[in-house]
């Protein structure tokens, strides 16, 4: 193989590695966003479980947020301690006793923790692959400079 052909092949391989690194970077960004969403959902489930635990306490005043941003908050003195509404998915809710709600929330927490673990594993593998490609590209760049 001629030197020119070898240089052409090397250039194509470098371009291929660069494309792979770019694709991995996008994939890593997507995984990080997905992980952040899952962790946010996990925290919301834990907060909901804590709220269910608070229902059983006597003589408590509750704050009910009118929206997600807290633009309006209602003080509530009386809450039915025997029933809660729990979101089942899509636009479905069920009225259940607090213990059933805790069971549903425990299951949801376990599912989200498993999803988080899987995403973190995939993220770790992707970052390792990206770093390996970046190292190769860095070495190639260093050899070009010599």
Curated annotation (Swiss-Prot):
InterPro entries: PFD_alpha_archaea, Prefoldin, Prefoldin_subunit_alpha. GO terms for cellular component: cytoplasm; prefoldin complex. It holds the Pfam family Prefoldin. Disulfide bonds: none annotated. One of its GO terms (molecular function) is unfolded protein binding. It comes from the Archaea. GO terms for biological process: protein folding. It is found in: Cytoplasm. Transmembrane segments: none annotated. Its main location: cytoplasm. Keywords: Chaperone, Cytoplasm. Belongs to the prefoldin subunit alpha family. Heterohexamer of two alpha and four beta subunits. Molecular chaperone capable of stabilizing a range of proteins. Seems to fulfill an ATP-independent, HSP70-like function in archaeal de novo protein folding. NCBIfam families: prefoldin subunit alpha. This is Prefoldin subunit alpha. The gene is pfdA.
